[in-house]
Amino acid sequence: PQTSNKVAAREWKERLRWKGDLRYRHESFDVEDRRDRTRQRIRARAALIADVNENVEVGFGLATGGDDPASTNQSLGDGFSTKAIQLDLAYARWASPIDGFDVIAGKFNNPFLRIGGNGLLWDGDLNPEGLALAFERGAWFGSAVGLWLNEESRDEDSYLVGVQGGLNADLGDAVALTAGIGYFNLLDLEGRPPIFDGDPRGNTLRADGALAYGY
């Protein structure tokens, strides 16, 4: 029995993977008509990923920072106070019998391709929440999502649906082309306060402080 227990423990150990990173950053701001500012920031992330079987993967991760969905940076200072650790990942991923198709549920890494890591649509630190279907086969890729933005007990929930698809083409002589198209629709946001921290982030507000449009 002891031998079988050791074998089982070793098999489980082989199914577990750790990943993480630590970054220290010095920031300096020199803005006209404002006082110069410097600050020290850290970012620490750690995640445990387990292969439950050949088709199912689950992941759990923690990260520094507050509850800002687009940042895991933590400013140092504040009298040596302890710093917050937040839930950054909690998901299950199922590899379907259809080759190249995966289903993901929970709080997961962004499944959409960000060309050059550009943050025009999606911040690099953002881990969305909801359901996703991811596809990758040969040069072709794609994703479809249903993401929950805000849960309301007395009104319709706000959410996002989106699709993206494209292909990666190797043109030879160290030249590659990535082409794709995407569609994203934010639902039940018009007439609601800005989500998360109340900051409209450039969006138009009505006189009562609610969003004038559905984005």
Where are these regions (language model features)?
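Short intrinsically disordered, low-complexity coil segments enriched in acidic
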Residues: P1-N5, R43-A47, S143
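Surface-exposed loop and membrane-interface regions of Gram-negative outer-membrane beta-barrel proteins
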Residues: R25-R43, A50-I98, F112-D123
